[in-house]
Amino acid sequence: MPPTRFQPSHQTPFKSTISTSQQSRIFHSPLQAGATANPVSISISDIDPSEWKYHAEGGKNVLLSFDPVGGIQAGKSPFATLTCTYALRIPKSLPSKSESNQEDEQEAEQFTRHVVQPLLGDATVLPKCMRIPIVTARDRHVIDMLSARIEMQRPAARRTHPARIRSEALSYIYAVEDVAAPVSVSPSAQRAVLCVEIKPKWGFLARIDSIPPSSPNVEIKARYSRYRMHRVAKHAAADHAGQMSIEQFERLYDPVDLYSCDSERKQKAIKALWDDWIDTKGKTNNLRLFWNGAVVDPQDSVTLEAIAQFLGTDNSVQGRLKGALTQHLDKELSKRVLGENDEWSTVSVLSRLAHLQSALDPLDVEGLAHLWLRRTQSHVLGQASSDVDLPPALTRNLAAAQLAAMLDSFLSGTTAEVSLEDAVQAFLVSASFKDCSMLLRFHQTESGVQGETKLVDLDSKPFAKLSSMQQTDSEVCAAFLAWLSQLDRSPAASVAP
């Protein structure tokens, strides 16, 4: 059967940087060290397990922060320099992977080098990162000691899952820039740092023409942001008494407001994130604050007052800290720092993210599943009968080097037709940008509070996740339609950025 074709019907706001981007000589997540102004060499022998503590973890990695006795002093350790303090990122693995997963680690690096960096257009928006080889039995013993040291600090749900640090499966770990750590200004002095983590989510609304006309979800996907619909679904599935009200829904954080170029809408989104952070006592997944590397509890009045003073305001007056933080976040999120093909023009990080998310997902998961059904006779995206002969692009993730050339057609507008194979692979890349996090770091300078933005959690999404993405989409839409059917009026729609 010949490849199924579709024809994109949208305009792209700027061209891809796949072919023209220049790779930075500074090493960035997660790449081998290159030529730098201040080269640093780090090995496992530099790691003292007693100097590290658990910081966070995701599905693939555990993050440890540097916490030596007496505090961090630049120059005393290769993990703390005048230009950067490093954390450790250690990949997790399952019991079945007792052998080294070196190929997986190398492909992850290639995904960043050949896909993520060129698409973003500027490698410096990614945290610095160095590969630390694991070679000897002693190296593995150090990893085992680190793992044992932090095991009981991990959340219970993570400890019960079989994925964990397994030294026998590691070829490398990584020293990554700790964006939340204080800024060193001398070997013994540091400046305070406020780091705000935002998980912005999807910055676009689906186009009506991307979804099969027979779908019951056409209107809701074109009117309401995916994040808000998902919140309704989660609320319905939780043990809450009663359903979410229209008023509650309209107060929810809406990503398309954050991605908007309109300052008023952006500030509305930031305030909604703050309110959710307060209401959930810091348990929300979309906003976290770090003060000098430590996560902030919204009930910690002492730390909140220190942050307020740092931002030049007073937390004793209700709403002032929220207002000051909103202003700083709005300013930082609006900065045009990423270059386009036109060397004279730049865009904000959020604008680039929104474009990549939407341009690489022109069909929506429903449109993609519709073409998959026509091609394979399977209703489950990513799965097909064993007697159906499929090319590699419809059975697994393509290598990063292959992806790079293929993605250009989605972003440049130079190709009228794109194959199903390409659409599936581009959809997976889009999912990486939909699920990333932003780290906004603020520190004091002589001219006042200055900010910078880094992007993290940009790992490739596995091909095997396609079916669960389709299922989640179906469940979210069904729950949202059920909720709408019980209302006496329609809630206010999202407004595209």
Swiss-Prot record:
The record's listing under InterPro entries reads: Ins_P5_2-kin, IP5_2-K_N_lobe
Q: Where is the stretch described as Disordered? A: 1-23
Q: Is Transferase one of the keywords UniProt gives this record? A: yes
**Which one of the record's GO molecular function terms can you name?**
ATP binding
What's the Enzyme Commission number for this chain?
Answer: 2.7.1.158
Q: Which GO terms describe its biological process?
A: inositol phosphate biosynthetic process
Superkingdom of the organism of origin: Eukaryota
Q: What class of enzyme is it?
A: transferase
Reactions catalysed, as given in the entry = 1D-myo-inositol 1,3,4,5,6-pentakisphosphate + ATP = 1D-myo-inositol hexakisphosphate + ADP + H(+)
Question: Which GO terms of the cellular component aspect does the record hold?
Answer: nucleus
**Disulfide bonding pattern of the chain:** none
Indicate whether ATP-binding appears among the record's keywords: yes
Q: Where's the motif EXKPK motif? A: 197-201
Keywords (alphabetical) are: ATP-binding, Kinase, Nucleotide-binding, Transferase
Please explain the role this protein plays, according to its UniProt record. Answer: Phosphorylates Ins(1,3,4,5,6)P5 at position 2 to form Ins(1,2,3,4,5,6)P6 (InsP6 or phytate).
Q: What is known of its domains?
A: The EXKPK motif is conserved in inositol-pentakisphosphate 2-kinases of both family 1 and 2.
The Swiss-Prot or TrEMBL record describes its family as follows: Belongs to the IPK1 type 2 family.
What name goes with this protein?
Inositol-pentakisphosphate 2-kinase
Q: Origin organism of this chain?
A: Mycosarcoma maydis
